[in-house]
């Protein structure tokens, strides 16, 4: 086991430490060489929504192959990759995306919830009685899966089944970026109902490094990866939204650093100029712990 001390984020109330969050961190290059780490980088984790770039890449890749990539706008790629707030622009973008490809929004199987942003959620609750699937932070991702189903000539109604060609494409892409196969024991269901995949923390860091240093990827996957990073850098609002770290980070670094959060204290980053990737996981699932740890690492 590759272990050392995890990063520790202390939360104070006055002069007293009220809580401690322990975070495993790995930074490595595109060949998987570890540059530095805190904690156990061999720990198997579900990156949660930090997996979304690798769920988006198969769609961009097939559109490139079919020479229709120009029909997927930058903000559309960003929202497919994102975990959005369900703000007006987010919902409008997902709706127009589905309309463009003549897909009924009732086919979305992402579930419904109020916005991840409390102030946005409060406004939503005043406007409507119950949330809709379009408001789900994952509606963009699910729209992307439906579009991919359509271009593969696959049925749309069961696009979330693990054996569906869309999910098999995504599985293959994740295995490519991880550099290893994913056993059935490491496949489960994410909060939005989509299959999700677990792997060692260090391998997810390698996956993010490959987004920064694409020369080790097949040409079509490298091209799709570059398009994804560029789209998020130019349209950071659509990857998260108002008062969200993902949007702030991607807006500030303009593609030099790409970042994507995941539930239960996960975060992934790629560093374009360094050709490195980072993945971190807060052991107790704290979003606060993960974001403070990320800020510390970026500062260092």
Regions found by a protein language model. Name each.
Residues 1-42:
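Beta-lactamase-like hydrolase cores
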Residues 1-2, 72-184, 192:
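Active-site-adjacent helix/loop patches that line small-molecule binding or acyl-intermediate pockets
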Residues 14-17, 135, 256-260:
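Short Gly/Pro-enriched turn/cap motifs at secondary-structure boundaries
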Residues 20-25, 143, 171, 264-267:
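Short glycine-rich loop/turn motifs
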Residues 28-31, 62, 271-274:
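Short acidic-glycine loop/turn motifs at beta-strand connectors
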Residues 47-65:
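Active-site SXXK
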Residues 60-70, 102-106, 153-158, 165-171, ...:
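Bacterial peptidoglycan biogenesis and beta-lactam-recognition machinery
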Residues 209-300:
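Structured C-terminal helix/loop/strand segments within mature extracytoplasmic catalytic/sensor domains
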